[in-house]
Amino acid sequence: MNTIQGHVVAEGLKFAIVVARFNDFITSKLLDGAEDTLLRHGANGDDIDVVWVPGAFEIPYMAKKLAETEKYDAVITLGTVIRGATTHYDYVCNEAAKGIAQSAMSTGVPIIFGVLTTESIEQAIERAGTKAGNKGSESAAAAIEMANLNRTFR
């Protein structure tokens, strides 16, 4: 039996990070975690491009555009959607998730879902570097692993 795993070594890989500006007091912390993880695992700072978009709903469009350039080994998406009093939350979460998955499948480039979907501001803060770790960092580690796996099958 053969086991194939991706390695968490970012040297020689190129990454794009799409970050939603909405709730930037959270998304900026996710970005810090992602950049730190990429650099600690050997990525060159010049091989990391960060693109800011207005909100989570706009993430899939930009992620797909970046993946289609064939410049990147992986695209990381970062955003924060916090439940409010209306159904807007449900639409944004569902469409962002669906759009990101469709973009990855249609381009053949790993696009990592790093969009927080939380019930409260407190939950978002916990996932941006306090109690529950930093989901931006976790997304970057997943991007490195998937980029290496993807190279295995080219």
Swiss-Prot record:
Single annotated GO MF: 6,7-dimethyl-8-ribityllumazine synthase activity
GO cellular component, one term: riboflavin synthase complex
Positions with a binding annotation for 5-amino-6-(D-ribitylamino)uracil: 22, 56-58, 80-82, 113
EC code(s) of this entry: 2.5.1.78
Disulfide linkage: none
UniProt xrefs under InterPro entries: LS (IPR034964), LS/RS (IPR002180), LS/RS_sf (IPR036467)
Binding residue positions for (2S)-2-hydroxy-3-oxobutyl phosphate: 85-86, 127
GO biological process terms held by the UniProt record: riboflavin biosynthetic process
SUPFAM superfamilies attached to this UniProt entry: Lumazine synthase (SSF52121)
Subunit annotation: Forms an icosahedral capsid composed of 60 subunits, arranged as a dodecamer of pentamers.
Xref: PANTHER family: 6,7-DIMETHYL-8-RIBITYLLUMAZINE SYNTHASE (PTHR21058:SF0), 6,7-DIMETHYL-8-RIBITYLLUMAZINE SYNTHASE DMRL SYNTHASE LUMAZINE SYNTHASE (PTHR21058)
Family, as annotated: Belongs to the DMRL synthase family.
Entry function: Catalyzes the formation of 6,7-dimethyl-8-ribityllumazine by condensation of 5-amino-6-(D-ribitylamino)uracil with 3,4-dihydroxy-2-butanone 4-phosphate. This is the penultimate step in the biosynthesis of riboflavin.
Listed name of the protein: 6,7-dimethyl-8-ribityllumazine synthase
Source organism (scientific name): Bacillus pumilus (strain SAFR-032)
